[in-house]
Regions:
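Short gly/ser-rich loop at a beta-strand->alpha-helix junction or flexible surface loop bordering the NTP-binding
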Residues: 1-181, 200, 217, 306-348
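Surface segments flanking catalytic/ligand-binding clefts of nucleic-acid enzymes
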Residues: 6-9, 22, 159-348
């Protein structure tokens, strides 16, 4: 349809506004059937196609829902996370979550989930003109209500963006001790780490801890003997000289520089891995599909640790043998079993 035939040009079109502009329900219905409008929910439409991104669609659904609320409420939980720009994993976004203070009732519909809970004034902020729980309250709500892995993903992202801090989270956690979900929240907060740089890294860490394969550190810098930075890895098991890398398409996209394509980044990553191996570190990699099979990821990392440990043992043996060959006298000075160096045989 032409510009003259279109309803008012806004990303979100409300039925009441269209009717006020002279449009009828029949006309709106025809536009929906023709695919020129998409119905978000009853009485709310968007022009042309819906965004492919789930978070972008949910932002539109939030706006469409909030304008129809008859009583004050703050957008909360995963809906608040979307407004704050926190990435989510495996969290349903088919309904808008809001929180009202006590004496309200728990409204639930196909597109709305209303929580009734105490809500301090300083726990509410505004995003794009919409009342929303602040990042800390949002994080606590998610930590109380989501499964552990999904909660850690959101908390990691907030900590990495410095929208959250462990000290503030732990302080606010004291306010909800004994409340439903408070133990789950405490566990998720204890597991969260802002050094994770992606959903995949967060999920990997949770899985590795669950399978008793925790890395000794994150974002480990491998340096040459002269102290030159060779590369930084997502995970490290320093005792075995093993680093771990989660490979995701989003990660490679984030590394792109102007004029580069993904192939250039993959080649640069291969060169970086070769340089890390040249410093006598082993490398283990995994991809998104393996996060859906935690047993396979755990088996891959366990085998890599065993190989790296065996390599370390052989290297130490070779180094010891080389040292003895260069200094045969040291072999004669090596204490025999049951004999203390510089003293009489040990008593039995």
């Amino acid at each position: 349809m032409t510009d003259e035939q279109r309803p008012p040009a806004t990303p979100l079109l409300l039925r009441r506004d269209a009717l006020a502009s002279g449009w009828s329900d029949d006309e709106l219905g025809r536009l929906v059937r023709a695919g020129e409008l998409n119905r978000l929910r009853r009485g709310a439409y968007v022009d042309s196609v819906l965004p492919a991104d789930a978070a972008a669609r949910h932002r539109l659904l939030i706006r469409a829902t909030v304008v129809g609320l008859r009583r004050p409420a703050a957008v909360s939980h995963q809906s608040a996370a979307v407004l704050h720009g926190l990435p989510l994993w495996d969290v349903p976004l088919d309904r808008v979550h809001v929180t009202r203070r006590p004496r309200a009732w728990n409204d639930t519909s196909r597109v709305l989930r209303c929580h009734v809970a105490r809500l301090r004034d300083d726990e509410v902020t505004e995003v794009d003109g919409i009342a929303v729980t602040d990042p800390v309250r949002t994080a606590l709500d998610l930590a109380r209500s989501l499964p552990h892995e999904a909660a850690v993903v959101a908390l990691d992202a907030g900590l990495h963006a410095r929208a959250l801090s462990h000290d503030v989270l732990r302080g606010r956690l004291l306010d909800i001790v004994g409340a439903p979900g408070s133990r789950s929240a405490a566990r998720a907060i204890a597991a969260a780490d802002g050094r994770s740089e992606s959903v995949g890294e967060s999920r990997s860490r949770v899985i590795l801890h669950r399978w008793k394969l925790p890395p000794s550190t994150l974002q480990y810098e491998v340096r040459s003997a002269g102290g030159v930075l060779v590369g930084r890895s997502d995970f490290a098991w320093e005792e075995e000289r093993l680093v771990g890398e989660f490979d995701g398409r989003i990660k490679y996209g984030r590394l792109l520089r102007p004029g580069q394509d993904v192939g250039d980044v993959v080649f640069a990553e291969k060169r970086r891995e070769d340089a890390i191996r040249d410093e006598d570190w082993d490398v283990v990699r995994w991809v998104w599909a393996e996060l859906h099979r935690p047993d396979r990821l755990a088996a891959r990392v366990r085998r890599a640790r065993e190989r790296a440990s065996a390599t370390m043992t052989r290297s130490r043996g070779v180094a010891l043998a080389a040292g003895l060959l260069q200094n045969p006298e040291s072999a004669n000075n090596t204490p025999r079993a049951g004999v203390r160096a510089g003293g009489p045989p040990a008593s039995r």
